[in-house]
């Protein structure tokens, strides 16, 4: 499961969800329903798209970060016009992710 936080106008959420699910699932070779796009409410009137994509390794960021940002931006700005699109990343190692109290990564979780 990949989580993507969207900060931006409510009216853009359907388009953002569609593009982000399509592009992230293609890049990560997973099903689109494995990409959760969550809108976070902000107190900002700008018509911009801000996305925070959670990845599990620095390698994903290195290999996919720029290309994924370009594909998402192109999908949300097909003619090169439209809102500014910010794509940023957080790396959350699987050893620090828990589902129903069980570690999602390989090996034992540590907090070092």
Q: Which residue ranges define each predicted feature?
A:
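Interaction-mediating elements
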Residues: 1-112
């Amino acid at each position: 499961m990949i989580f993507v936080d969207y900060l931006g106008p409510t009216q853009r959420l359907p388009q953002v969800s569609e593009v982000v699910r399509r592009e992230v699932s293609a890049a990560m070779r997973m099903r689109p329903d494995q990409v959760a796009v969550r809108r976070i409410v902000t107190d900002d009137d700008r018509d911009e798209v801000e996305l925070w994509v959670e990845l599990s390794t620095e390698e994903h960021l290195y290999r996919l970060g720029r290309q994924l940002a370009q594909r998402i931006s192109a999908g949300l700005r097909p003619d090169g016009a439209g809102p500014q699109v910010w794509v940023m990343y957080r790396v959350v190692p699987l050893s620090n992710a828990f589902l129903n109290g069980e570690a999602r990564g390989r090996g034992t979780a540590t907090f070092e």
